[in-house]
Amino acid sequence: MRYIRIDKVEPGDILGKDIVDINGKVLLKASSDMTLSENIIAKIKERNIQGIYVDDEISKGINIEEAIPMTVRHMAIKALKKKDVQETEKIAEDIVNNFDGKVEIDLNRMMGDVSYFERAVNISELCLSLGKRLEFSDDSLSKLVASALLADIGLIMTEEEKKQILEKVPQDLREKILSLPNESASPILGKFVAAQNQADPMVIHSVYFHKENENGTGVIQNVYEQWGIQQKCDVRDTAKIIHICSDYIDALIRENDFTKARNMIEEGIVQGKYNYILASNFLRFIPMYPIGTLVQLSNGEIAAVVKNNDGFPLCPIVKLQTGEQLDLTKTLNVVIQDIYYSNKKGKQL
């Protein structure tokens, strides 16, 4: 199977995977005879679903699995919708315990997950993958995942919730916070939410500082300077990892392009935005071409990505239309030239 953006789906395509809404409800069940009609495609679009999985000859035998079980994902989304900090911390442990590190990250799906809640779970998945690569302990991974899930909780607070959270804050400080733009106020509000719900100190720190840059600039640093506070942000690795992963997901959603999202991280390293060691490790495991992606090879053939080679994001294992597989780390005279969908050339997926 392979993932296709909904605007690229055509009548006659076969649904390869159940279509599930944000609450875990199955909207359309996949089967070998589930051929999509114009009417069904229109109804899928009405649900604001960004893309689906289809089965076709070239992607036959390619299974795209979930690193985080869907049941656990939906539990996390439910807790976030309730803004339940303690429940989110518990679910973060479940995510770590149930995470399958052998399953490749499904960037195609992440590119279509545009809701705040899906985005938060996707960021936590990337953070967890990087944390495992860096050999974090399970306890540290749980705190990292909880921090990633809660990082932008300030963005979804109502005006009434903001006032309630800041109720015990001195009036002059409360007015300063409420007068800030949403992006600047969000980490401050998130810190108060986490602290007032007895979150782990590492979670509180990471929520507060996850928008700070390696070169000493950033959202909170700018607020400090604006308020005349002579203090430099001391940012820990958990917050730095969330910064990298959240920026990548945002670029992926905004650009609809794996290459542009990756280039944004590379440019950020050069500009001093991201920690070099953490960002470099991130780029080593993030694939340029996710499983199921159709690509055009330099020999003129079209192929589907079957598996990515760790450390070689430009050289996956691909399956030709003949069924033959090529490992591009070993077939040095063949490279990927472009991305295809439905045999139609297109950079934007």
State each model region's role:
Residues M1-K90, E214-V235, R254-L349:
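Terminal helices and disordered tails flanking the catalytic cores of nucleotide-processing hydrolases
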Residues I14-I19, D100-L107, E160-K163, A239-H243, ...:
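Short amphipathic alpha-helical segments, especially helix-boundary/capping motifs
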Residues G24, L128-K132, S246-I249:
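A broad detector of the eukaryotic-type serine/threonine protein kinase catalytic domain
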Residues S31, D113, G131, A251, ...:
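Short, flexible active-site loop motifs that bind/organize anionic cofactors or intermediates
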Residues I41, L128, S186:
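Short glycine-/small-residue-rich flexible loop motifs, especially phosphate/cofactor-binding loops
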Residues D55-S179, Q196:
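Acidic/His-rich, divalent-metal-binding segments that scaffold phosphate/diphosphate chemistry
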Residues I123, A146-M157, V169-S280, M288, ...:
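Alpha-helical scaffolding flanking metal-ion-dependent phosphate/phosphodiester catalytic sites
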